[in-house]
Amino acid sequence: MKIINGILRNKGLITIGAVLSFISFSLCFFSLTNNYALYEQMQEIRDVFSSDLDKTYVMEFSYVEDEASFAEDINAIKEKIRNDYHISCGAYEETWSSFDELSTNAEYLKCNENVLKDTFYADMPDCSDMIVMDTDMLNFVDVGITKDMLEPVSKGGEKFYPLFVGKGYKDIIKVNDVLTDCYYGNKYIVKGYLDDVNWFDSSDAFTFPVSDMNYKFLTSFSDKEISDYNMQLNTVNKIYLKMDSADK
């Protein structure tokens, strides 16, 4: 009886102890869950890279003094790194554009209404999500294509840039279709599809989860994009160096 009375008198302390134990257990559980989720996310990011991450570096810029000349400056730096030091150096940018031929394609617009639902571009189904890059990026990631497959071709005095399309559009966009970018006026020729390929987050490759490219487009920088300081400025902190290709 004394034991029972003691328990009843101290039930407040027991309750507090139970609550604290529950909180401690919950925090431990959430910590383990978050660590596992982070591990899984980092593994997904590692799987996107085909290069050795111990020898892969990101070129970072804390300050850009002259934005207007950035495109010219950064391209000169990348060329010097490649030519003088024989180091793979590539950058990419995820951008939104629109193709003249697709902006009036009912099937494409209907498909994109579902793809872009609940996003910033929900009211703009003609928008196309594009990954544009230096071909040297193919030394860092494996998307099932090679550098020569991204080489532009000339026909009738016009330059056509190879374009690879996410498999989600396979029934809408066909190989050898020609698409015209409404912003730069670039002409693209569809060369193939991206099957089960992932890519980095547009803001930060190492902080945010990867996403699939089922409804994205992949191509190389056009001449106009290479010289466009806005486009090149957006590649800041997405410029990669592969040191195992350097001269010893």
Task: Describe the function of each predicted region.
Residues Y63-E67, D195-V197, K242-A246:
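Structural beta->alpha junctions
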Residues A71-E79, W199-D201, V210-M231:
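Polybasic, proline/glycine-rich intrinsically disordered low-complexity segments
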Residues S227-D247:
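A short beta-strand structural signal in non-transmembrane regions
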Residues M1-L32:
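N-terminal Sec/SRP start-transfer signal
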Residues Y121-T219:
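Hydrophobic secondary-structure segments that place a key small or acidic residue at a functional site
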Residues S31-T135:
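Membrane-proximal extracellular/periplasmic loop immediately following the first transmembrane helix
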Residues S51-L53, N83, S154-K159, L233-N234:
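Flexible, charged surface loops at secondary-structure boundaries
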